[in-house]
């Protein structure tokens, strides 16, 4: 900070400068000038643009554009004398170097710019367009000056400014950032970080994607391969289930998307759980429609707009960012179909007994029904409307009661009166009592009027109970 103050004081321009450190949680855009890293990989002469040659706002724009391009994997520099920096399938080195970069190096970008630049851009951009800048970077108007600019971070005619080591390091930083940004398994988090700028936790900067959706459509016209990425941004939701001793990730997507999830899942598992996982043990298979029907949890997703308030520069700026939150609906028809196939109810949802379980003890019967109900409840607790969840609980509860009554050759009503509230306790468990994967809560910033996140638990459904005992 002392260097920053000295740098601003020595600046030959007496006009006011603006510094906008844009904070996420573990990522930060901050300042830098021509020093460090063998000559600052982010430096380029900007005299041709008409302002301070130490400022590099255009380079900032190129950097951000580059971050959202298609190439998410680390690649090596075109140097035959150098070994590959990180191989495509070498997950160990990918994990090691990405963590080293994120922990040791900070992505530093110099973003001071002059008032005359701001005023000139304000004349170019109409007020109506300013209102539509929903990107996380909308506080930088110059980032929207050329929406169709799809060039690399450094043009070919200036690539010689960087040494080979710096080019390799820069690509390292860029790919590490993109990999962490796009493929963190946020659906495992109990609570999203406050500075993710998304209430659903699907992406760190999902508002940027939706704010730029028209821009992506323009790219689709010129480059057909971008269509899949555009669809991927619109439907990024992933499902997790444990099925017959295996962990299954379910998503609608292309084979390339599944390979990216596989790559990051290996790194995520090894880093957070300190457990070595062999990539070849993760298989990519296509589930048939009947498999989805049997699992019975292919949920519907609504995207509702909401406002997130960002706190920046120690209360100096309060910015309301429009984001789109997931609101999941319980697929009650699919669940009833699965329960009917497993002989817990009729196709119309009327509870029936489970004759095959009548040979078990009362405790085992109640435990099996209760375990199924609790696991389904944990999965469906992410929905804001729980009427369908209560219906599923009703079916399982009365199916359990009918099974016990059939075992004891008694009427269901009489059996429920004799059992009392003990049966109810097995089917209603508070969410706080569920053992789930909990990440540390971010406490650096807080949002005005923030509420508890609706979450998806790691232990979602044990469909084994619907299979092995049917």
Curated annotation (Swiss-Prot):
It is found in: Plastid, Chloroplast. Keywords: Chloroplast, mRNA processing, Plastid, RNA-binding, tRNA processing. The keyword RNA-binding applies. Disulfide bonds: none annotated. Its main location: plastid. One of its GO terms (molecular function) is RNA binding. GO terms for biological process: mRNA processing; RNA splicing; tRNA processing. One of its GO terms (cellular component) is chloroplast. Belongs to the intron maturase 2 family. MatK subfamily. PANTHER family: MATURASE K. Usually encoded in the trnK tRNA gene intron. Probably assists in splicing its own and other chloroplast group II introns. This is Maturase K.
């Amino acid at each position: 900070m002392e260097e920053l103050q000295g740098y601003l004081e020595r600046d030959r321009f007496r006009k006011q400068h603006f510094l906008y450190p844009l904070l996420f949680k573990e990522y930060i855009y901050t300042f830098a000038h021509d020093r460090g890293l063998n000559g600052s990989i982010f430096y380029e002469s900007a005299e041709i643009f008409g302002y301070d040659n130490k400022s590099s706002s255009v380079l900032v724009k190129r950097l951000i554009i580059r971050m959202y391009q298609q190439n998410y994997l680390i690649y090596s520099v075109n140097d035959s004398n150098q070994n590959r920096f990180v191989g495509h399938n070498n997950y160990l080195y990918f994990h090691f170097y990405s963590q080293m970069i994120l922990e040791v190096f900070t992505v530093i970008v110099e973003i001071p710019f002059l008032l005359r630049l701001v005023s000139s851009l304000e004349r170019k951009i109409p007020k109506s367009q300013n209102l539509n800048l929903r990107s996380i970077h909308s506080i930088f108007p110059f980032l929207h000056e050329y929406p169709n600019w799809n060039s690399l971070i450094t043009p070919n005619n200036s690539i010689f400014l960087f040494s080979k080591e710096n080019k390799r390091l820069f690509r390292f930083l860029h790919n590490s950032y993109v990999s962490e940004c796009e493929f963190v398994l946020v659906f495992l988090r109990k609570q999203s970080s406050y500075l993710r700028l998304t209430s659903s936790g699907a992406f760190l900067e999902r508002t940027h994607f939706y704010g730029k959706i028209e821009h992506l459509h323009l790219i689709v016209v010129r480059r057909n391969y971008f269509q899949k990425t555009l669809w991927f941004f619109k439907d990024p939701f992933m499902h997790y289930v444990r099925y017959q001793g295996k962990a299954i990730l379910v998503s609608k997507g292309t084979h390339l998307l599944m390979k990216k999830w596989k790559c990051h899942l290996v790194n995520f598992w090894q880093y957070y759980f300190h457990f070595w996982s062999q990539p070849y043990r993760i298989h990519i298979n296509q589930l048939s429609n009947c498999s989805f029907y049997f699992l019975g949890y292919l949920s519907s997703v609504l995207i509702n707009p909401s406002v997130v308030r960002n706190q920046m520069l120690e209360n100096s700026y309060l910015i309301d960012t429009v984001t789109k939150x997931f609101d999941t609906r319980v697929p009650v028809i699919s669940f009833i179909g699965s329960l009917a196939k497993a002989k817990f109810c009729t196709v119309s949802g009327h509870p029936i007994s489970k004759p095959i379980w009548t040979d078990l003890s009362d405790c085992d019967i109640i435990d099996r029904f209760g375990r199924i109900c609790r696991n389904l409840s944990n999965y469906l607790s992410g929905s804001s409307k729980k009427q369908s969840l209560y219906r599923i609980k009703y079916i399982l509860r009365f199916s359990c009661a009918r099974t016990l009554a059939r075992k004891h050759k008694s009427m269901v009503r009489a059996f429920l009166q004799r059992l009392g509230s003990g049966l109810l306790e097995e089917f209603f468990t508070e969410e706080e009592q569920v053992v789930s994967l909990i990440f540390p809560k971010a406490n650096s910033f807080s949002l005005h009027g923030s509420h508890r996140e609706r979450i998806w638990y790691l232990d979602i459904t044990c469909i084994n109970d619907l299979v092995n005992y049917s």
